[in-house]
Every structure is written in C-alpha cells, then in structure tokens.
Amino acid sequence: MTEQTPTPQLPADENSLIAERRAKLGALRGQGIAYPNDFVRTHFAGDLQAEFAEAETWTAEALEAADRSVKLAGRLMAKRVMGKASFAQIQDESGRVQLFLQGNVLGDAYTAFKGWDVGDIVAVEGGLTRTKTGELSVKATALRLLTKSLRPLPDKWHGLSDVEQRYRQRYVDLIVTPEAREVFIKRSKIIRAIRAWLDARRFLEVETPMMHYIPGGATAKPFTTHHNALDLDLYLRVAPELYLKRLVVGGLERVYEINRNFRNEGVSTRHNPEFTMLELYEAYATYHEIMDLTEQVIRDTAQGVLGTTQVSWDGADIDLAPAFRRWRMDEAVRHHNPEISAADCTDRAALLRHCERLKIKVKPSYGWGKLLLEIFESTVEHTLVQPTFITDHPVEVSPLARASDTEPGYTDRFELFINGKELANGFSELNDPEDQAARFQAQVQAKDGGDDEAMHYDADYIRALEYGMAPTGGLGIGIDRLVMLLTGSTSIRDVLLFPYMRPEA
C-alpha cells in the first residue's frame, strides 16, 4: 500500500514537526511508561511474505481458516486512516507487511493509532488475511506504540537526495533506502562466504595487534598514537603482514585475518583511512598457487552470494568465470607504450625520459623500478577492465616479496586489477633474512630521503626469519573494493556503514 502514503507536510518547518512529536511524547510520559520493553515478537514481515506468497493458494479465506496468530514489530512507514478502518505498513529488518486495523476491534488503541506518526516503532498482534487487491495483511487484534520517533523521516519520493547526508546519517539511509540495506546485507554474506571458503581449506583465522611498535607490512603513512602508561608512541597498523608471517615461522602454516587497517592518506571514491582487508599466508605455496586461490575465492564468493559470476561495475560488464589474464608488468607497459623497449624497462635514464615525455611527475630518488611502476599506473592500470593479474613487479617497489630466480631486479609478485582498480596484492614471500634486512635498509634510506610511506627497519621480524620461515605465499584482498565489485557500487563510501567524513560545521 506504499502508493497510498499521504504526501508529507513539505511546507511545514522541521522544527515545528519535532515540537509536535515531543508534545506527543510528553503525553505518553504522563500516561506511564513511554518506552515499553516487554513485547516479544514471534514472526518477521519478510518471512510471512515468503511463506504466503502464493495468492491463489493463500486466499483471504484460506489464511483466516489457518488461524495463524502472529506478533510483529517494526517501524511505521505508511498509514491511511479511513474512519472506522485503517491501513498501515510496518518495516522490520526482513521487509514490510501491511496492517489492517479496525476501530471496533482495537478500541482505544485505534484512537491512539490515529495520532501516531510515520517513523514510530509499533507492535501488532493478530491473524493473517488478504485484501481485495491481493496484499497479505495482518488483521490486528492488538496494537501498541513501542518507540516514539521525534524526527520526521525524509519523504518517500525524494528520500535522502543529499549524498553526503546519506553517509553522515546512515541510520536514516538504512530506514528509507532499501538498496542501501541490501548492499550491507550482501557485504556480510560476502565476508561470511570468504571465511567459510578458507575454513574449509584448513586455514586458521587469527587476530594480530592493531597497535604496532613499528609500522610495517605495507608502504603507507601510519596514524600515530601514544600509550600513556608506557610513555610510548605506537602506530595503528597499516597491515598485519609481518605478524602473520611470524605465525608461519611458528608453525601455523595456513593463517588468515579479516580486519581493519589504517593508513593516514587521502580520501577518494576508492580510499578510506580505515578499511577492511583479508590477508592470508600459506606455507609451501608460490605466487602462482596464490593467484589460483585468489581467482577461485573471488569466483566462488560471487557465485555463492549473487548466484552468478557476471557483474556490472561502474559502467563495465565483468565476467569472473573465465581464467583471469596473467600479464607481466613490463610487458603490459611496453604493450601500451610501444616507444618503450624491453631494454628501457630496466634503464633508469631511459625511463626518466619516457616519464618526462608522458608528463609523469617523479622524484629524484626514484630508481628504475619505481619509474616503471609510475608509467604502469599512469598508462596501463585504467585500461584493465576484465580481471587481470599484473605480475613480476620490480624489487624496488616490493620490499617484502621474494626476488625472481630468473629475472634480476624483479619479484614473484602480482596485483589483481578489475575495471582499472586494484583488488588484491600477493607474492611469494621473502624468507631470506639477509635479503630482507638489506631491503629494510633500502627502505630506511628512502624514508630519510623524504618518502613518508617507506617502511621502518623491523629487527624482531628479521630475528623471526632467522629461525627459518618455510617457502610461503601471501595474499591481501581489499574487502571494501571486493564488495564494491559484487554490489556494483561506484564509491567506497557506499559499502562502508560509517565512512570517514569531515566533522559537520
């Protein structure tokens, strides 16, 4: 009966509407308990809609003959008062259902109902029937107000038209925008499906520290905090990688964590300062096996949650069923930049000339590896629409990845791109403690040269590697971006319940 909802009092000042509702709340307080908490529901709206969906089978007569008694509670989303009988619609977490209310049955409760407002939370008890228009309805025998809503909801025609308001007041967005609720329900299912997939393959879920003595595990600028009792500066983690690999050293050969990371960097449609990552490590796996795993977990999650491997994302139709393309970074750069030769890819002077020609800004400290990455990000990344693994990154930009046995200067690393966006990063892990120590030293020099995102030297992690870490493959998947892909969302803020926003003025 949503089409019967009365047009909201648009000309009325919101403050006056709030004042009216506060007056009603005052009257309720005078009558006793204004916010009762003794109602126990037995059913959900969506479950009833599903169970009795067959209108030809479950006619009004059949429903009333079944004599099913139900108790529901939810938010009043629409009401239509017609004198001795009225209709209303309530919404709970599962969906909506119509109420059929009769004055001669409900008595004083019916009189009270006439003064209730859309947005109030109510409880109803009764049997089931079907209206002449075929809509399943609860034929109320009892009706109560549980929570008085003091602020009017946005009208149904315009909803929350201000996108920023949707993010700031997600609680309102979830009430009035079914599509927003569906995104977050899918998000929960996606994470649950990933956990089940990994658990079935003997991966162990673990928890590692959120506050680190030394920021590490990724090239990123950390948030800093201070431990008062210890008088010690700490860092919110940018990645759990080094702790998870310590666990592999300890003999936990398949571990994963789904949790928050924090990076003190910019905000965009793809970046939020805090975000959710899946990070996993598997002993005796190479980056080739980890690519296989990445491909399969994404494909199976899509099929399990959506029932399909074909999705639309930001104007592109993505097919997750075929094998994902695997393409070396230097080959991808040369394909999109025919002027760059194979020899140029490891020649710093040549790459500097190409960056100047392409108007790519670089820093004097960049080596050939960083320059190659800059060219890739500027000229190739945005073209990768269908799922593509970009492999074999330079050592300079991969401080934790194992060096290639066959390609000097490169690593056994990959990143997964879909529709021009990075979704995953993985590699064969560097388990040579002396090589890792040298890479940390290079990162320290880069930091001293002004690179805020370069890593610190982690002596304890080197000590752990000196005990011996099995050959290992690792993976990180950005859960937020994966949810964006599988829900067709174009902004990371659409898949975060409470995205970062500047404080309201």
UniProtKB/Swiss-Prot annotation:
Main location: cytoplasm
CDD domains, per the entry: LysRS_core, LysRS_N
Binding-site residues for Mg(2+) 1, renumbered to this chain: 415, 422
Catalytic activities: tRNA(Lys) + L-lysine + ATP = L-lysyl-tRNA(Lys) + AMP + diphosphate
Pfam families according to UniProt: tRNA-synt_2, tRNA_anti-codon
TM regions (residue ranges): none
Name of the protein in question: Lysine--tRNA ligase
Organism this protein belongs to: Xanthomonas campestris pv. campestris (strain ATCC 33913 / DSM 3586 / NCPPB 528 / LMG 568 / P 25)
